[in-house]
């Protein structure tokens, strides 16, 4: 009694009643709504008309955006100017939508409307009028700055040179004919610049030892016989006889006798006394014998007078009487015995030493 009024509506339905479905809960037709990913979600399992489905599908194609012809790889320097197409829908008698385009003439018209911002590839103009060139290096993954140029052509040629260096023959350049002309110019420059070897032959200087008797003999350079310039003898120089050109110039021969290298020594010597071996220099006979007739001096009295040779060689036997020493038991010995060291080395034994017995005795003590 107390609770019957509250729960009377909770009584179960008879078994013959049907189950609730979506059609019973939402009897009106639901329009499809857009979801993520461009898919359509339908609220209920309602059969749709074929004509409405075709119209909705065509509307989806129109609103999907640009066609696949517009998509592609674009350069940084290319600017695409495309006018948006104006679409108009017209309904036919059978309620099918037909699309008519205004201002769309196909892909050929679009490609004609594509316009490059710069005439050359890889360059751009600065606000102050200069032209900058740069290129992307695929190996480094960065843009390489090529510099700023006064004209667009100079910048384009700099881009072409760097592109050929990086990509080789596959590079896209602004001036394809530039490499052939550059090679021709390089070939012409190499042929024009031929090596010119101009070696000046300088006369060699050789000393003439044909007048060894004169210590102040002048040493003159031997003239090169291939040159046509005559040899000019300077003033204030001692006379040097002319040599025969056919005779070879030989160096002086220096002879040193082994016997003359022996040094004389005694028990009582001085530190400041220096003794050197005798070294004689002898000129070759060929240079002295082959003297031209021009070596003789012409005088007024005699037609040919031989030149006066100073410091002529003197034989030692001629000076032997003047070189005798006042020695006891050796006054008559030859100088040859002294030079050959035939004398005894014991100088002390040959000397007579005095003693106190030899002194006279005085009578003062």
UniProtKB/Swiss-Prot annotation:
The entry's keywords: Activator, DNA-binding, Nucleus, Phosphoprotein, Plant defense, Transcription, Transcription regulation
Highest taxon above the source species: Eukaryota
Predominant location: nucleus
Keyword Metal-binding: no
PROSITE patterns: AP2_ERF
Cited function: Probable transcriptional activator that may be involved in defense signaling pathway. Binds in vitro to the DNA sequence 5'-AGCCGCC-3' of the GCC-box element found in pathogenesis-related (PR) gene promoters. The transcriptional activation is enhanced in vitro by the presence of MPK12/BWMK1.
Name of the protein in its database record: Ethylene-responsive transcription factor 1
Lineage: Eukaryota, Viridiplantae, Streptophyta, Embryophyta, Tracheophyta
